[in-house]
C-alpha cells in the first residue's frame, strides 16, 4: 500500500464525517478547515491567501470547478513527503473527526486511545477500496494476533462464535463493536487488551519487529550497558529506558548487514553481534530463547532489506491477499466445476429424456410402420385381386377376340375358296368369251336383226348397273363394319396392353388377316366386275333368234355353229346364277333373263 493510499483512507473518514446528509457533498467552509489542518499535520507549506482563493464562494476556484478529490491529490497529497511528518498526527486528526460522529463506546471497555489504535490497524489491513471495509479473514487474523500477544488461548469454536455475527465484509464500526462485545472480553481484562492493542499497533503500524532490553558493549570503553532496543526493518535503535525518551544510538540495517551468534566469553553468556559495513555491535540477551528471538528478528529485517520490502506486515498482507485470491479462484473453479458437473448432469438427464423420447418415438414409428406395412399389404392384396380380375377379364376378352379372329379367319378361308371358285369361273368365262367372240364374227351379218336384242341388252345393262351399285353399297357396309371392328379392337387392345402384352401378336396376326381379306376382297371385286362384264356379253349373245327368220344354211353348218356352244353357255350360265344367288340378293320385281 502506497503512502497516498494510506493517507487517503484516513482522509476519507474525515470527509464522510463532514457529509452529514450522505449526499457526497460537504460545504466549502468545512473543506477549507479540513484542508488547513491537513496542510498543518503533513508539514506542507501553504499560503493562507491562496487557500482562501481555492475555497471562494464563487465558481472560479479549483474546488468548485474540479471537486475536492482532484484538489486533495494535486495540492495536498502530491506534496506530502514520507519522513517529513508524523503519520500518527494525521491519523489522530481524522480519527477525532470521525469518532465524534460514528464511535459510541460501550461503557469503558476500550479507551479512546485503544479505539484509535484499532481504527489504525483496521485501516492498515483493510481492502484498497471505498467505502473502507475489511474481509472476514483479515478480521480473524487481527483477532488471533491480539489473542496471541495477550497470551490468551481461544479455541476455533470460541473464535467462530465471536465472528458468527459478522458479515463477509466488515466496517470499522462493526469491528469495534466486536472488540467491545462480552463474547470477546469475557476472558480478558481491559488492561491486558490495552497492552495487546498497543503492542500490535507498534508491530503493525510502526513496523516494530522486536523490542526489549539487551546488554550492549560500548564501542570505546568496552563496558556493557543495559539498553532498550527497538528493531525496525531499516534500523535497530536503543534507548535509555522503555519510555523511549532519550535515544542513545541507532544501527542502520541494510542488505549487507549480518548477525552472528558469539560464544560465551568473559563471563558473558547468550552473546550475538550485528555486523554492518563499518562496525560490529556486540550484544547479550538474558537467555538463549531471547537471543534466538533477536537473531531471528534481525535476520528478518535483513531479508526485508534484501527483498526491497519496507514492511513485514505489508508483505504478509500481500501474501494473505494472494492466498485469498487463490482460494477465491479455487472456490470459483470448484463452483464452476460443480456448475459444469451440474450442467453435465442436467445435460445427461436431458439426453436421457431425449433418449426416452426417441425410444418412445421409435416405438410409435415402428407401430405406425407396422400398421403402414399391414395397410400396404392389404392394398397390395386388393390391387393383386383387382389385377387378377382385370387379367381374367383380359383373358376373356382375348379369348373372345381369338374366337372372333378364328371366325374371321374362317370367313377369310371361305372367301378364299369363293375367290378360287370365281377364278375358275373366270377361266370358264374367258373360254366362253373366246367362243362368243368367234360367234360374234359369225353373227356380224345379222346385226340388223339383232337391234331389238341390243335394246334388251341395254335394259339388262341398267339392271346390272343397279346390281353393281348394290354390290358397292354392300362392300362399303362391309368396310364400315370392318372399321368399327378395328376401332373396338384398338380400344380393347389399349385396355389390355398393361395386363397382357401377348395380345399384340394376336393383333398383328389379325392385321395380316385383314390385309389378306382386303386383298381377297379386292380380288373379289375384280372378279365381280369381270363377271358382270362377261354377263353382259353373255346376255348379249344368249338372246334367241326369232323363229320367223329363215336362213339358208345347211343342216350340218347350223348344227356345227350353235349346237355345242349353246349347251356350254347354258351350263355355265346356270353355275353363274347359282353363285350369284349366294352372294347377291336382287331387288323385288327385277330378274335376269336367261336362255333356255
Swiss-Prot record:
UniProt-listed InterPro entries: EF-hand-dom_pair (IPR011992), PH-like_dom_sf (IPR011993), PH_domain (IPR001849)
SMART domains hit by this protein: PH
Domain annotation PH: ranges: 207-303
Keywords: Coiled coil
Superkingdom of origin: Eukaryota
Coiled coil (residue ranges): 311-541
UniProt cross-references to SUPFAM superfamilies, sorted A to Z: EF-hand, PH domain-like
Record's GO cellular component terms: cytoplasm; nucleus
PANTHER family (UniProt xref): DIFFERENTIALLY EXPRESSED IN FDCP 6 HOMOLOG, SWAP-70 RECOMBINASE
Protein name per UniProt: Differentially expressed in FDCP 6 homolog
Organism: Xenopus laevis
Gene giving rise to this polypeptide: def6
